[in-house]
Design a protein with these regions (language model features):
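Conserved lysine of the Walker
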Residues: 31
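Hydrophobic anchor at the beta1->P-loop junction of P-loop NTPases
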Residues: 23
Length: 219
């Protein structure tokens, strides 16, 4: 596991200002790995992907009362039905707890995540590996970073694997787009995504893109 001290420091600094740290970022950017870098003896880790965790958090107050650790990590919190309620109860009723919640950066744009946490949280947006972090990734160079991309797994790989990003894109659609926004046309999403990549840095004309891709403007 590659340690990323830059981000660990940002999390600790954010806790000094608010009880909740919202760690967001694109899929596979290293959010879960970063939570594992916290001292295990101080952390109560909850994987919200698991049905048992969802059931356990139906009564957030009871969950917090039974917690014996000073840090609670909710990994993939957007899998919960009402994540903002779980976080708000923790911040208001158990102010001594430090809470770290991870999830997709698209979650804030959904109705599922109402902004009822004003003054209670700080956001840390985990980016792909930055230039200043290359030293933490061993033999990674700027050239390799540009060729392999900035996600930790392909950056650590010895050879370029295009299938990783195809799998990543499929996962991004099924869990972040389809799951959160109920959008059910993967071929249209992929076409738009590739179009945006080709247009990177250029002007995006909605009407022109819709016509060229055969996608309606509202979509």
């Amino acid at each position: 596991m590659v340690k990323r001290p830059l981000w660990s420091t940002r999390i600790r600094e954010s806790w000094a200002k608010a009880p909740i740290v919202w760690l967001c970022g694109v899929r596979r950017s290293g959010k879960t790995t970063l939570t594992r870098d916290l001292p295990a003896q101080s952390v109560h880790y909850v994987n919200c992907d698991l049905p048992a965790s969802v059931q356990m958090l139906r009564d957030p107050e009871l969950f917090y009362r039974e917690c014996r650790r000073e840090i609670v990590v909710f990994d993939e919190i957007h899998q919960l039905e009402d994540p903002s309620r779980v976080l708000k109860i923790g911040a208001d009723a158990f102010p001594k707890l430090k809470i770290l919640a991870t999830g997709s950066s698209t979650l804030a744009a959904t109705r599922k995540f109402r902004d009822t946490l004003t003054g209670r949280k700080r956001t840390v947006h985990l980016t792909p590996v930055a230039f200043d972090e290359l030293g933490d990734f061993g033999a990674a160079t700027l050239k390799k970073r540009l060729l392999h991309g900035g996600l930790p797994q392909p950056l650590l790989a010895e050879t370029l694997d295009p299938s990783f990003y195809r799998e990543w894109l499929d996962s991004f659609f099924s869990r972040d787009i389809q799951g959160l926004f109920a959008f059910h046309a993967p071929e249209k999403f992929n076409a738009l995504f590739e179009y945006l990549l080709r247009q990177s840095g250029g002007l995006f004309e909605v009407a022109k893109a819709a016509s060229g891709l055969g996608i309606s403007r509202p979509t």
